[in-house]
């Protein structure tokens, strides 16, 4: 196991402290996590997204507004005494910033990005599909959220897809894009693209991002409307995507950067990175 070989991720220690699905990142593993989070945020900000650092707990209204509740209540951690939920994605608190809002047409587009830990009960504790970094109860993710005029939302979706493509290209990872068919779509989404990177060790593709257009589904629940200035108010369209989710990206970077001298990984940003080139490598 490469994470043990390089002493960068400790699953046994996480199991001791909390339980299965809560790894401890150590040494250069922790540095890699931090560097990637900053790298993703900087890439998003360079495209006009404004950074948000939201709460990690949300109330029931917030979970309902974005569609996690009641549908996915069994997959969310619930603090019963306070009736609050640990977020499964930054999409929930960030989109809820504009709950019960009337936006002027000149306020659009709204482009937000944020890093948060994410918490999901859905992960199992055994089996090949949940081993290592494949499925975790707690993981790090950087999200992008858009609130848009309905006439522009599909153009914006294409822009978001291209943006995620550019990040994966900078990381020089083998990836593919899937347009989900109707039967695979979540009930909140009108159109979703999944991004998958190839795992050499597992010899299969692993999802690292989903980019979705929810059209007016979320805005109808959230009551987010646009004032067009002629006494016309219509529901906005909301979109979001992962840019990016870290665990499987970390696994793919480790697997795809093995050399005879060790592992070449992205450990720190540089002036070249700030000009839009890939992050530099250093040997472990």
Question: Model segments located where?
Answer:
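Structured aminoacyl-transfer and RNA-binding surfaces used for tRNA recognition/handling
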Residues: 22-247, 251-265
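Intrinsic disorder/low-complexity detector
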Residues: 196, 273-275
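Conserved small/polar residues in nucleotide/adenosyl-binding loops
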Residues: 266-273
């Amino acid at each position: 196991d490469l994470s043990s070989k390089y002493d960068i991720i400790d699953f046994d220690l996480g199991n001791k402290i909390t339980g299965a699905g809560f790894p401890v990142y150590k040494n250069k593993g922790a540095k890699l996590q931090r560097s990637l989070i900053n790298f993703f945020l900087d890439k998003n900000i360079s495209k006009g997204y404004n950074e948000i650092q939201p709460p990690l707990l949300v109330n029931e209204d917030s979970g309902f507004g974005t569609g996690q509740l009641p549908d996915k209540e069994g997959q969310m951690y619930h603090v019963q005494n306070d009736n609050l939920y640990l977020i499964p994605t930054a999409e929930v608190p960030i989109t809820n910033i504009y709950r019960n809002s009337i936006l002027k047409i000149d306020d659009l587009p709204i482009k937000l990005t944020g890093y948060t830990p994410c918490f999901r009960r859905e992960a199992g504790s055994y089996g090949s599909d949940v081993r290592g970094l494949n499925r975790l109860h707690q993981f790090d993710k950087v999200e992008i959220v858009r609130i848009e005029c309905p006439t522009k939302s599909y153009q914006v979706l294409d822009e978001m897809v291209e943006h995620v493509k550019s990040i994966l290209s900078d990381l020089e990872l083998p990836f593919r894009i899937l347009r989900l068919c109707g039967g695979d779509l979540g009930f909140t989404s009108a159109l979703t693209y999944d991004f998958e990177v190839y795992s050499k060790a597992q010899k299969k593709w692993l999802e690292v991002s989903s980019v979705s257009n929810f059209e007016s589904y979320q805005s109808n629940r959230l009551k987010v409307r646009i004032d067009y200035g002629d006494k016309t108010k219509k529901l906005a369209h909301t979109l979001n995507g992962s840019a990016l989710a870290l665990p499987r990206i970390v696994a793919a970077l480790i697997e795809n950067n093995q050399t005879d001298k060790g592992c070449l990984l992205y450990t720190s940003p540089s002036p070249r990175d700030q000009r839009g080139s890939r992050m530099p490598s250093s040997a472990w």
